[in-house]
Amino acid sequence: MVYSFPLPVYKFGRARFCRSFRADGANYEKCPSKKETYYGFKVHALITLEGYITAFKITLASIDDWEGLRDFAENHLNLVILGDKGYTGEQLLEDMRSKSICLMSLKPSSYKTNWPKEVRQLIFRFRRRVEIVFSQLSEQMKAERVLAKSFRGLCTRLQNKILGHNLCMAFNSIFREACDIGRIKQLVF
């Protein structure tokens, strides 16, 4: 499943005084899910159905979700990728088909053709899993709390958070610990 989340580097009111990330391309963008404008970047992630993050990319905040998906498509072949409404469009579907990737994304209600109800429910169920993964990254691993002073430090910090998340998921599955998916650090820490 492919998904993206905002990564603000400064609070909105202090962003105009920011100098450290401006050279790296940090900019303003609106986040419709959080109903706020933020200054920073956007993280695109490719997540398995079990909840492991297999690939991620940090892009400018103003970059469309399609670009993050196209970068993932260059490195992966013969995949079935689930996405939300940000990954719809005939041009994107044709582009993914040419790379032998099946893209199944939720379509807005204005579309004439939509997936059957069972497929939409399946996509919603897997989307909840992805939202749990991102909430774990932001709440338990504090991924959205940026303490880095450079873009390289930001990337390193995010890599460590994602590695920690994947290790916690692996330990919980190896030891078959009865652990709620919302508390991945329960076994390790």
Where are the language model's segments positioned?
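Polybasic low-complexity intrinsically disordered regions
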Residues: M1-K85, G89-C102, P108
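Short, solvent-exposed polar/charged micro-motifs at secondary-structure junctions
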Residues: P8-R14, N114-P116, R157
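Structural motif
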Residues: S33-E36, K149-L158
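Hydrophobic (often cysteine-bearing) scaffold residues that line and stabilize catalytic clefts
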Residues: D65, F126, C155, Q159
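A general structural signal for well-ordered alpha-helical segments in protein cores
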Residues: W66-L69, F134, N160
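Helix-centered, glycine/charged polyanion-binding patches within enzymatic domains
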Residues: V80, K85-R152
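C-terminal domain-tail junction helix/linker
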Residues: T156-F189
